[in-house]
Amino acid sequence: MKTLYSLRRFYPVETLFNGTLALVGRDQETTGFAWWAGNARLINLSGKLLGAHVAHAGLIVFWAGAMNLFEVAHFVPEKPMYEQGLILLPHLATLGWGVGPGGEVIDTFPYFVSGVLHLISSAVLGFGGIYHALLGPETLEESFPFFGYVWKDRNKMTTILGIHLILLGIGAFLLVLKALYFGGVYDTWAPGGGDVRKITNLTLSPSVIFGYLLKSPFGGEGWIVSVDDLEDIIGGHVWLGSICILGGIWHILTKPFAWARRAFVWSGEAYLSYSLGALSVFGFIACCFVWFNNTAYPSEFYGPTGPEASQAQAFTFLVRDQRLGANVGSAQGPTGLGKYLMRSPTGEVIFGGETMRFWDLRAPWLEPLRGPNGLDLSRLKKDIQPWQERRSAEYMTHAPLGSLNSVGGVATEINAVNYVSPRSWLATSHFVLGFFLFVGHLWHAGRARAAAAGFEKGIDRDLEPVLSMTPLS
């Protein structure tokens, strides 16, 4: 009779993520993992795994510092940041360093300092990584029990979780301190076209902060991505920082409840899967944030959003034709709808033409021209400022829309600049990374659950191709 199930199911299987096998060395024979499996060889060597993590941090910080200095070296102050392929300097500018009114860069020295500090930090991390990978103790449990761990020790794992949460909370409060006391941050909504300012009136109301979480993610609602107020952003970081720190203290002081012990798989591979899942969510949220939000990601540095570029085109031609004598309030377009202005489904006065689909856009160069019922016709005739005209003309030709050969711009805009917007680049890269992190989460979660159930998913170790290959040494 043919067996319909794997006999392996009935034997306890210890994958090498479980941390119960007494292993030494870093080769195939002693770990079960070949050299190309990377850090999997170090699962039960806490000292060496620490070295790998510290060295990895060093590589990350080295890239940040080197790329930072590369962007500073190539930066042209006369051109907008978003036209120069910059992805790091916009973040520094958003934090208020080196910029003045209108987002104009007035000093590149803070950017240079940032790059140098990251390079110095990467050297320290690099030396630490090399030390722990090559010279330090293989395991930490004996000599440094505070830093040692066993993957199945639930209490130790939640203590480590708590420490991480506290560090995240401190990071959130660093932004709060920068905004409140150390020079402020760049506010794209500051009167006259944006400026650096200190945040003096934080939004701490839980109904406002947590109200964002209850919003619909669609249309004009936009969930947390719809935030358009720096007071709300910094106040949200106060809440997040407090929750992370209090949650961290909670996890350090307590042991997992019975339901948590039953619900979760407690192994190294399970923790890896949880981490990848969390990073995936972060990536998808960051993708939406950088694509749609022009407050946390000011258009002066990242370029306009797609809807913003489209609305800017309509506004630019309204300004032009109004000067040529057109009555923008009553002119009819080819479809019978208003050529320049029309009404939204809720009765607001909005721009006409194809940009009507973006009628709920909010942008600092446009909001001064709105009244209680949408765009105010009298303001459009009398109150348009030169900086609004200049900015909309610039945004009209720099839409974050591009094909594979980098030909970008609104489809109907013949003057579009051929470039890749950092907004496009950051949104796309975070979506792609978020997707692959999610796939990694599913893969490792499946393996971890299978191991907990008593069998191992993946390539049969007896049939691994590497076993038939010639050894490297």
Swiss-Prot record:
Post-translational modification N-acetylthreonine, affected residues: T15
Alphabetical UniProt keywords: Acetylation, Chlorophyll, Chloroplast, Chromophore, Manganese, Membrane, Metal-binding, Phosphoprotein, Photosynthesis, Photosystem II, Plastid, Thylakoid, Transmembrane, Transmembrane helix
Maturation propeptide residues: 1-14
Recorded family membership: Belongs to the PsbB/PsbC family. PsbC subfamily.
Residues annotated for [CaMn4O5] cluster binding in this entry: E367
NCBIfam families xref list: psbC (TIGR01153)
Naturally occurring in which organism (per UniProt): Phalaenopsis aphrodite subsp. formosana
Record's bilayer topology term: Multi-pass membrane protein
Gene: psbC
Transmembrane residue ranges: 69-93, 134-155, 178-200, 255-275, 291-312, 447-471
Note on cofactor: Binds multiple chlorophylls and provides some of the ligands for the Ca-4Mn-5O cluster of the oxygen-evolving complex. It may also provide a ligand for a Cl- that is required for oxygen evolution. PSII binds additional chlorophylls, carotenoids and specific lipids.
Localization terms from the record: Plastid, Chloroplast thylakoid membrane
Modified residues (Phosphothreonine): T15
This protein's record includes keyword Ribonucleoprotein: no
GO biological process: photosynthetic electron transport in photosystem II
Subunit structure: PSII is composed of 1 copy each of membrane proteins PsbA, PsbB, PsbC, PsbD, PsbE, PsbF, PsbH, PsbI, PsbJ, PsbK, PsbL, PsbM, PsbT, PsbX, PsbY, PsbZ, Psb30/Ycf12, at least 3 peripheral proteins of the oxygen-evolving complex and a large number of cofactors. It forms dimeric complexes.
Chief location bin: plastid
One CC-aspect GO term: photosystem II
Protein name as annotated: Photosystem II CP43 reaction center protein
The keyword Phosphoprotein belongs to this UniProt entry's keyword annotation: yes
HAMAP family noted in UniProt: PSII_PsbC_CP43
Pfam families associated with the record: PSII
